[in-house]
UniProtKB/Swiss-Prot annotation:
The keyword RNA-binding applies. The gene is infA. SMART domains: S1 (SM00316). Belongs to the IF-1 family. PANTHER family: TRANSLATION INITIATION FACTOR IF-1, CHLOROPLASTIC (PTHR33370:SF1). InterPro entries: NA-bd_OB-fold (IPR012340), RNA-binding_domain_S1_IF1 (IPR006196), S1_domain (IPR003029), TIF_IF1 (IPR004368). It is found in: Cytoplasm. This is Translation initiation factor IF-1. One of the essential components for the initiation of protein synthesis. Stabilizes the binding of IF-2 and IF-3 on the 30S subunit to which N-formylmethionyl-tRNA(fMet) subsequently binds. Helps modulate mRNA selection, yielding the 30S pre-initiation complex (PIC). Upon addition of the 50S ribosomal subunit IF-1, IF-2 and IF-3 are released leaving the mature 70S translation initiation complex. Coiled coil: none annotated. Component of the 30S ribosomal translation pre-initiation complex which assembles on the 30S ribosome in the order IF-2 and IF-3, IF-1 and N-formylmethionyl-tRNA(fMet); mRNA recruitment can occur at any time during PIC assembly.
């Protein structure tokens, strides 16, 4: 069975939560809870409040996501 395509959206980190979780406000105004992807964790990429990020959302649960990129 093939994996479902994830939805990629841009947003801004508005709050830092425990356990490398973040509250991200998407461009369309929705607020989601997101965690860091494994490669970002491996390369020690730090994310701070106010950073512009790219978030992948699954079509099954649009309230949770994975941060895959931090814009400079």
């Amino acid at each position: 069975m093939a994996k479902e395509e994830s939805i990629k959206m841009n947003g801004t980190v508005i709050e830092t939560l425990p356990n490398t979780m973040f509250r991200v406000e998407l461009e369309n105004g929705h607020v989601v809870t997101a965690h860091i992807s494994g490669k970002m964790r491996k390369h020690y990429i730090r994310i701070l409040t106010g950073d512009k990020v790219t978030v992948e959302l699954t079509p099954y649960d649009l309230s949770k996501g994975r941060i895959t990129y931090r814009a400079r």
